[in-house]
Amino acid sequence: MRLYRVTHAALVGVGIALLLSARLANQDWWDRHFLPIFALRRETLLIAEQTVRVVMALAGAALALVLARPIAGVLSRATLAGMLRILLALLLALGASEVALRARPPHPHDADSLQLEPRRQPDPRLGWVFVPARSVLALEAGRRVSYSFDASGHRVPSPGATVDADRPSVLFTGESIVAGYGLDWQNTIPARVSALLGMQSVIMAVSDYSNDQSYLRLAAELPRFRQPVAVVTLFMPSLFDRNLLGNRPHLDTGLVWRPAVQPWRLVQLFHWLIPYRSSAAIERSVQGTRETLCALVDLARSRGAEALIVVPQFEPESATDEMLRRRILDEPNLPYVQVKLDPSWHLPDDRHPDERGAKAIAAAVARAIPPHLLLPPRRCPAL
């Protein structure tokens, strides 16, 4: 009888805790601990968050008022041997799940498989790069898209095309938006900037990169180019969560390179399902992202190139979006251009910019690059 009372009280306590959690987890709490997600509209996230609160409240009420008694009755009659068998079965199930998840090729849980087109291959320092010297016609967002890459893994206009490292160039580093996911070459942001400025654009961007990886890619490639005119990268609050992940190569305080750390796959899956971030973790990533972007700007300027950070915006800026932009870009006075886009300017059933979105971003980039940088160097007249 005593075991029943203790179990019943514990279950009622859990139910009350769920009710209190649902009450305390207001919108401000959600905004502080669950970051924007690129693939989802904010209104979808708000609905999901409110649904979770309602489910927690209903579950807590049901447990405290209805289910606590029958569950306590069952548990109080259970034998030690029976409970051990259940525990063993649970551990075996978790172990089997971990083995099954590890059978898949490892890649960050927030990134696509490296085998999806355009294919990527592992890289010990960057995490992954596009497979070099390759062309493919892929089906992306319901359309056929041609991708071609040179021997260095830069996206190029056509098979066999190469990048001339001696020419004046605008260098683009970033992720799939910069790389032109779902767009043929001529419609990508770099290609449109090239057409507007009459200057070679070089795409160093690789799908699913964080800001750390984008910087590392630039640092590795920049020494090859003799006349870098500008370096363009991307920052989006809805992609900021990637910068918190240690399961890809990343930069620690002081720009110290760290290899990827692969935790238990079940833990990764749990974090993917419930992407809760502590205030301390977010603050560390704000500081780290700011340090990385400052280093990128300094690196570009050390070669006489202009640096520009592009901030595309599909939806009205939320309080979290504004906080991240202010803390990461405004406070250190980094050079950036915010590009507000029509919410409909994205690929079908996909959040990447379509031709209209890419055109608007490219126009903003071209306007932001100082005209004097586009002039050919003057030669001294012969004496």
Residue ranges and their predicted role:
Residues M1, V6, D349-L383:
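Histidine-centered active-site loop/cap adjacent to the catalytic His
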Residues Y4, L11-R53, P70, L234-L329, ...:
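Serine-dependent acyl-ester chemistry module
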Residues R53-L87:
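Cytosolic-side transmembrane helix boundary signature
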Residues A103-L196, S344-H346, L383:
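Membrane/wall-proximal cationic-aromatic binding patches
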Residues V170, A179-V256:
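Conserved SGNH/GDSL esterase-like catalytic core that processes O-acyl groups on lipids
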Residues R77-A103:
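Internal/C-terminal transmembrane anchor helices
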Residues N211, Y215, V286, R290, ...:
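Short, amphipathic alpha-helical "lid/cap" segments that border enzyme active or binding sites
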